[in-house]
Regions:
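Extracytosolic ligand-binding ectodomains
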Residues: 6-425
C-alpha cells in the first residue's frame, strides 16, 4: 500500500510486526573498570499506521485514518528520538513497533507473545484496541504507557498503567491559587457550561466554599465570585457583569465540547471596550481556530499548559538538535509527548533495575558509579505521578500556567505582576 512505501524511511516491516532497527551499543562500563553492569531496555509501541489497509480507487482512507496515521508517525519519530538519545548515553535499547489496526477481517497481526520481554508498552491510541490490550500487557509484566487522553476509570485496578496526559482536574488548584494571590480585589466571574465539564466545575466551586471557621481550602475568607450559567446558545447575563470601574476576571472551564460558549464569551468581551477583562480558561482554548489573537492579547488569556519547550535552555536545544539531525525539522506535539514519556519510563526502569532485590548494587554504588543526573532528560513534559485509585493506575498531575503575552504563550510566573487597577475618568 501507499503507507508501506511512505513508512519505509522510518522502519522496516517484518511479516508479523513492524520492527525498528535495534539500537544497541557496547555494554556500559561504569567507573570501576573491573565492573560491567548491563541494562537492556525493551520497548514495544502499538500505533495506528493502517498498514493493513488496502487502498483502491473505490476504497480511499478517511480523514480520520489519515490524521491517526499522521499522529502515529509523529509519535514514532519521538520514540526513535528518545531511543537515539538513550543509545548515545551508552545503553542498550530495543524498540518494536506493532500495528494497532486489525485487517479487514478484524484480525490483529500481533499477539501476547509479541509483548513478552517488554519493559514498556506504549499505546494503543484508539479506545477499542486499548481496552483489549490492557490485560495482555499486564500479564507479561510490562509497564503500560498511555499517550492519549483516556477516561480515568480505565485506571481502576490497573497499577501497571501510567497516563502521561495530565488529568484536567489537577489544574483547578493552579487557577484558584493564582486568582486568590493576584486577583482578590477584582471582580471574579465564574462562567459555567454544565455538560461534560459539570463535575470539574463543581470541584472548582468546592475549593472556595467556606468551612466552619469561615475559611476556604486556601485559607481565605475574602474572595467571592459571581456565577454566570452559560448554554449552547448564550453566556447568560455575562455582559451585565463586566464593569468599567473594576477589573473583571472571567474563569471558564469550557472545553472543546462547549466551544459555542467560548465563541460567545469572545464576542461579549470584544463588544465591550470600556471594561478591563482577563480570562482564565481550559487548556483546549488554545486549539480552537476561531479564537483570535486580539482576544488573547486583550484578556491576557491564561491557560493550564503541559508540554512547553524552554528554548533558552542549552540542554533542551542540544536534545532538539538530535531530532533535527534525524528529521530536519523541529518536533511537534506528539513527538515531544512520546519522547518525554519514553525517557521518563527509561529512567524509572533503570532505577528499579539498580535497586531491585536481585541487584548486587548498593546505594553508594548507584550514587557514585551511576550518575543518574547525566541521563537524557525530558524536553517539554514534567511528570508528577499520582495514583488515581487504590490499586489503580497513575496519572500525570503536572500542569503549569501559560499566559498570552506580547503575541506568544509564556509561562505565567515569568511575566511581571499586574499593576493595580486604575479607574479612568
Amino acid at each position: 500500500s501507499s503507507l508501506q512505501s511512505f513508512s519505509q524511511s522510518f522502519f522496516t516491516f517484518n511479516t508479523d510486526t513492524l520492527q525498528v532497527d535495534t539500537l544497541q551499543v557496547d555494554t556500559l562500563l561504569v567507573e570501576d573498570p573491573d565492573t560491567i553492569v548491563e541494562f537492556e531496555f525493551n520497548v514495544v509501541a502499538i500505533l495506528p499506521f493502517y498498514s493493513l489497509f488496502i487502498e483502491t480507487e473505490s476504497n480511499s482512507p478517511t480523514k480520520r485514518m489519515l490524521k491517526m496515521r499522521e499522529i502515529a508517525v509523529e509519535s514514532l519519530n519521538g520514540i526513535r528520538w528518545a531511543a537515539e538519545r538513550i543509545r548515545s548515553a551508552g545503553y542498550n535499547v530495543t524498540v518494536t513497533i506493532l500495528e494497532e489496526v486489525p485487517d479487514s477481517d478484524g484480525i490483529f497481526n500481533w499477539s501476547e507473545e509479541d509483548l513478552i520481554g517488554a519493559d514498556v508498552v506504549m499505546g494503543p491510541m484508539q479506545q477499542q484496541t486499548l481496552s483489549k490490550s490492557i490485560k495482555p500487557i499486564r500479564r507479561v509484566g510490562a509497564e503500560h504507557i498511555l499517550i492519549t487522553r483516556v477516561n480515568d476509570n480505565l485506571l481502576r485496578g490497573n497499577e501497571h498503567i501510567r497516563s502521561i496526559i495530565p488529568s484536567p482536574s489537577y489544574f483547578l488548584d493552579l487557577i484558584a491559587e493564582r486568582i486568590l494571590s493576584k486577583h482578590y480585589m477584582d471582580n471574579i466571574i465564574f462562567l459555567t457550561s454544565g455538560g461534560v465539564e459539570e463535575n470539574m466545575e463543581n470541584q472548582f466551586h468546592e475549593l472556595f466554599k467556606l468551612d466552619s471557621l469561615g475559611y476556604n481550602s486556601f485559607g481565605s475568607d475574602s474572595l467571592a465570585f459571581n456565577i454566570v450559567s452559560g448554554s449552547k446558545t448564550s453566556v447568560g447575563d455575562l455582559a451585565d457583569k463586566l464593569y468599567s470601574y473594576k477589573r473583571s476576571v472571567i474563569v471558564t472551564l469550557a472545553s472543546k465540547s462547549s466551544r459555542s460558549i467560548l465563541s460567545n464569551l469572545q464576542m461579549v468581551v470584544q463588544s465591550n471596550d470600556s471594561a478591563e477583562v482577563f480570562v482564565f480558561a481550559h487548556s483546549d482554548l488554545k486549539e480552537l481556530g476561531f479564537i483570535d489573537i486580539q482576544f488573547l492579547s486583550r484578556t491576557r488569556a491564561t491557560l493550564p499548559e503541559q508540554g512547553l519547550v524552554n528554548w533558552s535552555d542549552s540542554t533542551t536545544l542540544a536534545a532538539i538538535g538530535v531530532y533535527r539531525k534525524l528529521y530536519n525539522s523541529d518536533p511537534h506535539k506528539f513527538a515531544l509527548r512520546s519522547h518525554d514519556a519514553l525517557l521518563d519510563a527509561f529512567q524509572r526502569n533503570l532505577v528499579n533495575y539498580l535497586t531491585s532485590p536481585q541487584s548486587s548494587n548498593d546505594t553508594l554504588f548507584i550514587e557514585t558509579a551511576w550518575d543518574l543526573s547525566s541521563l537524557p532528560g525530558v524536553v517539554a513534559t514534567e511528570f508528577n505521578w499520582v495514583q488515581k485509585y487504590e490499586f489503580g493506575g497513575f496519572v500525570n498531575s503536572d500542569w503549569t500556567l501559560a499566559t498570552f503575552h506580547q503575541n506568544s504563550w509564556c509561562t505565567t510566573d515569568t511575566i511581571s505582576d499586574l499593576p493595580p487597577f486604575i479607574l479612568l475618568d
